[in-house]
UniProtKB/Swiss-Prot annotation:
InterPro entries: CbiD, CbiD_sf. This is Cobalt-precorrin-5B C(1)-methyltransferase. It catalyses: Co-precorrin-5B + S-adenosyl-L-methionine = Co-precorrin-6A + S-adenosyl-L-homocysteine. GO terms for biological process: anaerobic cobalamin biosynthetic process; methylation. The keyword S-adenosyl-L-methionine applies. Its EC number is 2.1.1.195. Belongs to the CbiD family. The keyword Transferase applies. Pathway: Cofactor biosynthesis; adenosylcobalamin biosynthesis; cob(II)yrinate a,c-diamide from sirohydrochlorin (anaerobic route): step 6/10.
């Protein structure tokens, strides 16, 4: 990509990892040169240059604390606008036996890993390997052989912000994660959100679950625990990204998946719609109308289905007609057929529910 100047750029954003690297660089530069920088130019692991503003910087003896405000560009998320504080302490006597002269630790508001299967060791702060590498790469240009630094990353209110993310489900407790492979948040790509979903699969496999339950979101999670007696780490929330998450599941060797969730989302899979966001495609009424027509040729019923406002309305129509189970069993079967033809090698089953968690239809490959 070359160079991005985030003093001017409003489309792209920068990751929490890039914030940490920029803050660490500015703090160390201040310690060594007694000069406050309003911005720094760092490089990511692809050797792109990122110019990132520094919000504030202070010095206390051999320690400097830099604050960088997270900017998400056009992909506004829960972390946009939060402060990340990076405290750097310089030691002129490097007697460390560690291979690196940069020690990176987590402070308040950075989560701690409590479940296996993630990129970071149990009990360690949730600072992913790529951000660590980016911090080290940029600081080494300022360090001599006999110098070492401790970099402490903190996020004020990080514990509260993290409650609105997937971190608690992933077993990352007490704060957010420091993430990012390139340091760049690309607009409207959903890349960062997709990447935050994928570790659920790693956690499930690390806990030796053979059958994973893929759900669209909270409704599916809640009722899978009740109806299927599923455990938290067995349930994988995919949001709208079925294509992405099923590709990840196949890459990671998952062999058995139960698709479970509300009819409004799951029905779309029967139509071959694997990004279920409404802006991509809908066709719920059309799909249900087609499968109802296999059971009844009552034109009035079919017209009502096409004109319905919600999937729940269609459920009521089919219930009154006495064909609810037959229609949704057929839809469930088609979901399994669609998924099996695209992701061969995985045994699929499907259960469709309503908002109350009542089963509407199911199909099991056996």
């Amino acid at each position: 990509m070359g160079k991005i100047d985030f003093r001017l750029e409003k489309t792209f954003g920068y990751t929490t990892g890039a914030c940490a690297a920029a803050g660490a660089y500015s703090a160390l530069y201040f310690l060594k040169n007694n000069e406050r920088l309003n911005f720094v130019e760092i490089v990511n692991l692809k050797e792109d240059s990122l110019i990132i503003p520094i919000k504030n910087i202070e010095k206390q003896g051999d320690t400097a604390i830099s604050t960088v405000e997270k900017f998400s560009g056009e992909d506004i998320d829960i972390t946009n606008g939060m402060d990340i504080e990076i405290e750097v302490t310089l030691n002129l006597d490097n007697n460390s036996s560690e291979s690196s002269n940069v020690d990176i630790i987590g402070g308040i508001g950075v989560g701690i890993i409590t479940k296996s299967g993630l990129q970071v060791t149990l009990g360690k702060p949730a600072i992913n390997p790529k951000p660590r590498e980016m911090i080290e790469t940029n600081l080494k240009s300022l360090l001599t052989d006999n110098e070492c630094v401790t970099v402490k990353i903190s996020v004020p209110n990080g514990d509260e912000i993290a409650k609105k993310t997937l971190n608690p489900k992933l077993g990352i407790i007490g704060g957010i994660s420091i993430l990012g492979t390139t340091g760049i948040v690309r607009p409207m790509s959903n890349d960062a959100y997709k990447e935050s979903l994928a570790p659920q699969i790693d956690v499930a496999l690390a806990n030796n679950f053979e059958n994973l339950i893929f759900v669209p979101g909270n409704i599916g999670t809640k009722h899978a625990k009740i109806l299927l007696h599923a455990e938290e780490d067995q349930i994988i929330e995919v949001s709208n990204f079925w294509d992405y998450m099923l590709n990840k599941a196949k890459e990671k060797g998952v062999k058995d998946i139960t698709v479970f969730g509300h009819a409004g989302k799951i029905v779309k899979l029967a139509g071959g719609i694997f990004d279920t966001h409404s802006k991509v495609a809908d066709a719920r009424n059309e799909i249900l109308c087609a499968y109802t027509s296999l059971v009844t040729q009552d034109v009035e019923i079919l017209q009502k289905i096409l004109q319905s406002n919600t999937t729940e309305d269609i459920v009521e129509i089919l219930t009154e007609k006495g064909i609810l189970k037959e229609v949704f069993d057929n839809v469930s079967k088609r979901v399994v057929e669609r998924l099996s033809s695209r992701w061969d090698g995985i045994n699929f089953s499907c259960i469709i529910i309503n908002m109350k968690g009542n089963m509407l239809g199911k199909y099991d490959q056996g």
